[in-house]
């Protein structure tokens, strides 16, 4: 199947993977921070934006479809659910993923004893809003992320414009992605990956707690972890320059 992709810039290949319920347009305001140094590919995951749905939507089939669509090798940046897709792709095709940035992402989304994450009940409450009224839940989610930012209104207008330009995700894709968030456990995959890995976390993130950085560092030898002050779950939108600089520096050192 052919997934919808957009490519811009020149230089080493970078692939951006969006999160649950979104599409590649979410990166539009962030891409210019990268294209002076990198050739950036954005993709709509199956059933999101302009990409068709997969008959069998699973972490493995989605990662496989993305691998078929993007340049190889590339430095992958996975945001939220996109981090899980990137981890699975790195497991399936190590030579295709030169390095991996987990951007407010985690190998295990749901909290467990000794593992920071979102409580399962909270995740289901959050997801129910998107499943019952996607547009309203999306507005509320983005407003929460932008709250308190100096350019709050401008930021919200820009992001809403970027998201409204493509169809909303298909319900089966939302449900399948939710199952991945609830049940996937890629900690063993992360532990064994040969590629360089960094984690970028926001101190105001209410979905992926900033405390995860310490757990990731214990899990993966050599993992680089950065905490972005005042950043919510979307630091590439609220702190684009800082996020891009950390990606630049990490890739340069990989």
Swiss-Prot record:
- Alphabetical keyword list: Biotin biosynthesis, Cytoplasm, Hydrolase, Serine esterase
GO molecular-function annotation terms? pimelyl-[acyl-carrier protein] methyl ester esterase activity
**What is the active site of this protein?**
80 (nucleophile), 205, 233
One of the GO biological process terms: biotin biosynthetic process
Q: Which reaction does it catalyse?
A: 6-carboxyhexanoyl-[ACP] methyl ester + H2O = 6-carboxyhexanoyl-[ACP] + methanol + H(+)
The UniProt entry's GO CC annotations, sorted and at most eight, read: cytoplasm; membrane
**Which Enzyme Commission number(s) are listed?**
3.1.1.85
Family annotation (InterPro entries)? AB_hydrolase_1 (IPR000073), AB_hydrolase_fold (IPR029058), AB_hydrolase_sf (IPR050266), BioH (IPR010076)
**Pathway entry:** Cofactor biosynthesis; biotin biosynthesis
Where does this one sit in the cell? Cytoplasm
Listed binding positions for substrate are 20, 80-81, 141-145, 233
Is the keyword Hydrolase in the record? Answer: yes
Its primary localisation, in coarse terms, equals cytoplasm
Please verify whether the record's keywords include Hydrolase: yes
EC category name: hydrolase
Instruction: List, alphabetically, the HAMAP family matched.
Output: Carboxylester
Record text on subunit structure and interactions: Monomer.
- Which protein family is it in? Belongs to the AB hydrolase superfamily. Carboxylesterase BioH family.
- Describe the function of this protein: The physiological role of BioH is to remove the methyl group introduced by BioC when the pimeloyl moiety is complete. It allows to synthesize pimeloyl-ACP via the fatty acid synthetic pathway through the hydrolysis of the ester bonds of pimeloyl-ACP esters.
Protein's UniProt name: Pimeloyl-[acyl-carrier protein] methyl ester esterase
Organism of derivation: Methylococcus capsulatus (strain ATCC 33009 / NCIMB 11132 / Bath)
Please name the gene that encodes this protein.
bioH
């Amino acid at each position: 199947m052919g997934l919808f992709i957009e490519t811009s810039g020149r230089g080493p290949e970078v692939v951006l993977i969006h999160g649950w319920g979104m599409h590649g347009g979410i990166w539009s305001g962030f891409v210019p921070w990268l294209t002076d140094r990198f050739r950036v590919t954005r993709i709509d995951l199956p059933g999101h934006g302009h990409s068709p749905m997969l008959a069998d939507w699973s972490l493995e089939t989605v990662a496989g479809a993305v691998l078929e669509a993007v340049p190889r090798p590339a430095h992958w940046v996975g945001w939220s659910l996109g981090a899980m897709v990137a981890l699975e792709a790195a497991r399936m095709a190590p030579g295709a993923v030169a390095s991996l940035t987990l951007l407010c992402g985690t190998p295990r989304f749901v909290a467990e004893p000794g593992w920071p994450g979102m409580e399962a009940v909270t995740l289901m409450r959050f997801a129910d809003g998107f499943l019952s009224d996607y547009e309203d839940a999306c507005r509320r989610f983005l407003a929460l992320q932008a709250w308190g930012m100096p350019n709050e209104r401008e930021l919200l207008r820009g992001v809403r414009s970027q998201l409204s330009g493509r169809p909303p995700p298909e319900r089966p894709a939302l449900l399948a992605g939710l199952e991945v968030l609830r049940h996937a456990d890629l900690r063993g995959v992360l532990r064994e990956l040969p590629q360089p890995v960094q984690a970028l976390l926001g101190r105001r993130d209410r979905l992926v707690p900033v405390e995860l950085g310490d757990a990731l560092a214990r899990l993966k030898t050599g993992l680089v972890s950065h905490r972005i002050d005042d950043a919510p779950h979307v630091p590439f939108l609220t702190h684009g320059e800082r996020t891009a600089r950390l990606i630049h520096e990490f890739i340069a050192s990989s």
